[in-house]
A protein has these predicted regions:
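C-terminal scaffold of the Radical SAM
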Residues: 2-5, 24-53, 57-342, 411
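A short, conserved structural fragment
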Residues: 356-378
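Local cysteine-cluster metal-coordination motifs and their immediate loop/turn environment
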Residues: 11-24
Length: 412
């Protein structure tokens, strides 16, 4: 058994951002060198264990995230080379921050086998970057994207909207500058204020204004209009790409493929059969029978402690419906038929009709065609229900409706 995707987590940054609640440690100089080296040694042992178990043989995508992977310098290159010695993924992404993405490191990562770089730009306004606690400037970010492109990487840029003090004009300027860099991919996220972060404390103390959710929604819609007008098509609620440049790794997450996560706070997801084939890597779940899907998060550096969650068939299919509604391709007829095998078809149709009536989903065919396909009277393929513009903007409502299908709360 081999998983479809591999995620590697690097829990180090040169400095923590004001909004960040990720499992990362701020470290520099000799402290980063010693802590980072010890972490990488443990991580590589886990990679080798996975390779010996045959789990990496057919990996199609690899993603190294953080934290800030590029703070590791040459040790990051060692990780890439080690992984490449066990598999030949079609997409190999590494996250990078502009201030630590040097020409020397970019060249080494390219030669080691990284194919795609995702840059944590967040904003191209220096005042907004300072508020977020970012330690790079807008000009550094622009140079980093240019460097990545010159090394032959497929490039992605992360941006955040709805920042305190951010105006529609400054947001549009950031989007314009990002497009001018000719990046292949842009991810756009509304700012989330997490409890316990410096940003949260500043808002509570009245030093910073709380994000306006209505303005965030407007900014997300402006991003849609501007990015699609510049050749970047929306393929997921927060993701835009040029043709053929979609993030395959994230699509694997959204389509229920199995993935292995290695490193502190890395998440894995398996079917019960997949888990049985690689249980020696975890040794934490005695009997996964009855579980359709198993999700686990590594809690330590060594890979000896995990938080485990199991999903029933009904929960797994409700989750797949929810994830399908995040993507422009929407919910397929095949997924709908599989869902109808464990969720009462009348309940399923009731929820879809409610979403359509609310303007959150659009159907590719008539209701009669949909009902016939569900009853298996007609064999159909392709998408059957796709998110509308309203569905994108009111995603939380749509996703909640579909996830609620995992419960038996209403009779069919």
């Amino acid at each position: 058994m081999s998983v479809d995707s591999l995620y590697i987590h690097i829990p180090f940054c040169h400095a923590r951002c004001t909004y960040c609640d990720f499992d990362t440690k701020a470290a520099c100089g000799s402290q980063l060198l010693s802590r980072g080296d010890a972490y990488v040694q443990k991580l590589l042992r886990r990679v080798r264990d996975a390779a010996r178990a045959g789990v990496l043989e057919r990996v199609e995508t690899v993603y190294i995230g953080g934290g800030t992977p590029t703070v590791l310098g040459e040790r990051l290159v060692d990780i890439v080379r080690e992984i490449r010695s066990y598999c030949n993924p079609v997409e190999f992404t590494c996250e990078a921050n502009p201030e630590s993405f040097t020409p020397e490191l970019a060249f080494a990562l390219s030669h080691a086998g990284v194919t795609r770089v995702s840059l944590g730009v967040q904003s191209l306004d220096d005042d907004e970057l300072a508020l977020l606690g970012r330690i790079h400037s807008s000009s550094q970010a622009e140079r980093a994207v240019g460097l990545a492109r010159s090394c032959g990487f497929s490039t992605s840029v992360d941006l955040i909207c709805g920042l305190p003090g951010q105006t529609m004009a400054s947001w549009e300027k950031t989007l314009d500058r990002a497009c001018a860099l000719e990046t292949d991919h842009v991810s756009v996220y509304p700012l989330m204020v997490e409890d316990g972060t410096p940003l949260s404390r500043a808002i509570e103390a009245g030093r910073v204004a709380e994000p306006d959710e209505d303005l965030q929604a407007e900014m997300m819609d402006v991003a849609r209009s501007l990015l699609t007008g510049r050749g970047l098509e929306r393929y997921e609620v927060a993701s835009y790409a040029r043709a053929g440049k979609e993030c395959r790794h994230n699509i694997a997450y959204w389509t229920g493929k199995s993935y292995l996560g290695l490193g502190r706070s890395a998440a894995s997801m398996f079917s019960s059969n997949d888990y049985g084939a690689c249980a020696e890597l975890f040794d934490v779940l005695d009997d996964p029978s009855g579980a359709s899907r198993i999700r686990m998060v590594q809690l330590d550096d060594e890979g000896t402690a995990f938080d485990v969650e199991t999903l029933s068939s009904r929960e797994a299919l409700a989750e797949d419906l929810m994830l399908g509604a995040r993507m422009s391709r929407g919910i397929s007829y095949d997924l709908l038929r599989r869902a109808a095998a464990v969720i009462p078809p009348s309940r399923l149709l009731e929820t879809l009709k409610e979403a359509v009536d609310l303007g959150l989903l659009g159907l590719s065919d008539s209701w009669d065609s949909l009902e016939a396909a569900l009853s298996c009277d007609v064999s159909r393929s392709g998408p059957c229900a796709m998110p509308t513009r309203q569905g994108w903007l009111m995603g939380n409502q749509l996703y909640g409706m579909l996830w609620d299908l995992h419960e038996d709360a209403r009779s069919s």
